[in-house]
Curated annotation (Swiss-Prot):
Organism listed in the record: Saccharophagus degradans (strain 2-40 / ATCC 43961 / DSM 17024)
PANTHER family xrefs: GLUTAMATE--CYSTEINE LIGASE
Kinase recorded as keyword: no
One Pfam family named in its UniProt record: Glu_cys_ligase
Gene Ontology terms for molecular function: ATP binding; glutamate-cysteine ligase activity; metal ion binding
Listed pathway(s): Sulfur metabolism; glutathione biosynthesis; glutathione from L-cysteine and L-glutamate: step 1/2
Enzyme Commission no: 6.3.2.2
Residues spanning the signal sequence: none
Reactions performed catalytically: L-cysteine + L-glutamate + ATP = gamma-L-glutamyl-L-cysteine + ADP + phosphate + H(+)
Name listed for the protein in its UniProt record: Glutamate--cysteine ligase
Length: 530
């Protein structure tokens, strides 16, 4: 049902191993800073961590209390995890009496006013980042922005693309060929990422304070402090999590690079009444949002995966993509693993590599608006009832299929890809990762979401108490083996350099913010016009 139709046999040749050993990976892991009682930290971003605006590895997301750790791109999985360990270990050593929340769904929250928006200083770039977040708060509420996730960045080496380019006798320029193939990967990813939500969803329950005053269909677990759905996998990926009902009417086309850019640019440059009503500035002239369009910038579009290109200073992400093509893809549908101190583990990464390479090699027809609607329905099904024995996945070509049957068939189709990666890396870890996840398909009780519900029920623990206990445990685990003195010194140097860089940016600030914003948005108009 999901088998790759035209597998390139030459990939099995040992001399072609560099075609796959050159895969580049990176992780972005978010985590809320909390006090020892499990409440959201009200303190500013610690100076010892450097500038959240300019530090390359430690920054903040929506809230001043929502940390984000960014590993540099690396070829080796072992190096990836050492980097993530070092970043988190250094950070924890500088947090004084605070912890990092272990889960995707947030700690006990009070009203929106107690959720501090991230601050990035007085430069135009820093002001823009803060105003964007203020706008998110007005549009969706600040509570939704405290949800944490894990992003996986992935790129295949030029050697791989050159190999395919030759095998397929393509007449395209290599970058154009890569763009075409990355968008094909993305289309297949969107067809099948329901499997990742099922396997790695780890937010089946949440603290009642998160949805206080909002309509919902969640049920109490033990008591009203913890709400859940019996067969849920990832409430983070559902309507109550990091999603936007306002964007449900937005159809973004993934059939080629220009269509993707054009549809997103239109959403950024077309005002809508709902956001006009918020207003652009308050009575004091302070900005309430960057614009009144459906999207302030491309980052506001909530998607499971993004095509990416590293942007230059002052360049929009879409301009970078238009000018230089796809560099890597960013997987955005992963929950924090509350059972692991780092929020992710090596077998999961091996599985993701296999899944993404499968998506790259599998035939990938264009996606229609009807299939896109089908994809979203599958996401909602797996989010709310993925572990139900009655859960059905909608295949756009084959109709409704039991989730267990679809998952088993997809894993089977991925096996040749896992074997390919094992041969290239001289390991069995990719095949083993498939077998581990196949077991979770056949037995839903092995999934992280089921394990969490089982633990809460058995111990009669509220969600917030459980997540706080995990946070304390992970804190002690990571601090027990601090990074080396040399690594600590490197991070201290990075922090100092980032603070200096922010100061220099603020000193050379030119023009007022309104003019800066006007110039910045001209780039989107150029993207629309092309």
């Amino acid at each position: 049902m999901y088998e790759i139709q035209s597998f390139h046999a030459g990939l099995y040749d040992s001399k072609n191993a560099p075609v796959l050993t050159g895969i580049m990976r990176g992780i972005e892991r978010e985590g809320l800073r909390i006090d020892r009682d499990g409440k959201l930290a009200q303190t500013p971003h610690p100076v010892a961590l450097g500038s959240a605006l300019t530090h390359p590895q430690i920054t903040t997301d929506f809230s001043e209390a929502l940390l984000e750790f960014i590993t540099p791109p690396t070829h080796r999985v072992e190096d990836l995890f050492k980097q993530l360990y070092d970043i988190q270990g250094y950070t924890l050593s500088k947090l004084d009496d605070e912890l990092i929340w272990s889960s995707s769904m947030p700690c006990v929250l009070n009203d929106d006013a107690t959720i501090p928006v991230a601050q990035y200083g007085s430069s135009n770039n820093g002001t823009m980042k803060t105003v964007y977040r203020v706008g998110l708060g007005h549009r969706y509420g600040r509570a939704m922005q405290t949800v944490a996730g894990l992003h996986y960045n992935f790129s295949l080496p030029d050697a791989f693309w050159s190999f395919l380019h030759r095998e397929e006798y393509s007449l395209l320029d290599l970058q154009d060929f890569k763009d075409q193939k990355y968008f094909a990967l993305i289309r297949n990813f969107r067809r099948y990422y329901w499997l990742l939500v099922y396997l790695f969803g780890a937010s089946p329950a949440l603290c009642g304070s998160f949805i206080k005053g909002r309509e919902h269909n969640l049920q109490p677990l033990i008591d009203e402090r913890t709400l859940h759905l019996p067969y849920a996998t990832s409430l983070r990926m559902g309507d109550l999590g990091y999603q936007s009902s306002a964007q449900e009417s937005l159809y973004v086309c993934y059939n080629d690079k220009q269509s993707y850019i054009t549809t997103l640019c239109a959403a950024i440059t077309t005002p809508i009444d709902e956001y006009k009503a918020i207003g652009l500035q308050d009575e004091k002239g302070e900005f309430k949002q960057l614009n009144t369009s459906l999207l302030q910038i491309e980052n506001e579009f909530y998607s499971s995966i993004r095509p990416k290109r590293t942007a230059k200073h002052g360049e929009t992400a879409l301009s970078a993509l238009r000018n230089r093509g796809v560099e890597y893809i960013e997987v955005r549908c992963l929950d924090i693993d509350p059972f692991d101190p780092l929020g992710v583990n090596k077998p999961q990464v091996r599985f993701l590599d296999t899944f993404l390479l499968y998506c790259a090699l599998q035939d990938s027809p264009d996606t229609s608006p009807e299939e896109s609607a089908n994809i979203l329905r599958n996401q909602k099904t797996v989010v709310t009832e993925g572990r139900s024995p009655k859960a059905l996945i909608e295949s756009f070509t084959k109709g409704k299929i039991p989730l267990k049957q679809a998952g088993e068939a997809l894993i089977k189709a991925m096996r040749p890809v896992a074997e390919l990666l094992d041969i290239a890396h001289e390991t069995e870890e990719h095949t083993q990762s498939l077998e581990t996840q196949l077991a979770a398909i056949l037995n839903p009780e092995l999934t992280p979401s089921a394990r969490i519900i089982s633990h809460l029920s058995a111990k009669k623990l509220p969600y917030a108490h459980y997540a706080l206990a995990q946070s304390r445990h992970h804190h002690e685990t990571l601090l027990a083996k601090k990074p080396s003195n040399n690594t600590m010194q490197q991070f201290e140097k990075m922090a100092a350099e980032s603070l200096d860089k922010q100061t220099r940016l603020e000193q050379k600030n030119s023009g007022n913010f309104s003019e800066f914003l006007q110039e910045y948005y001209k780039q989107y108009q150029m993207c629309c016009d092309k």
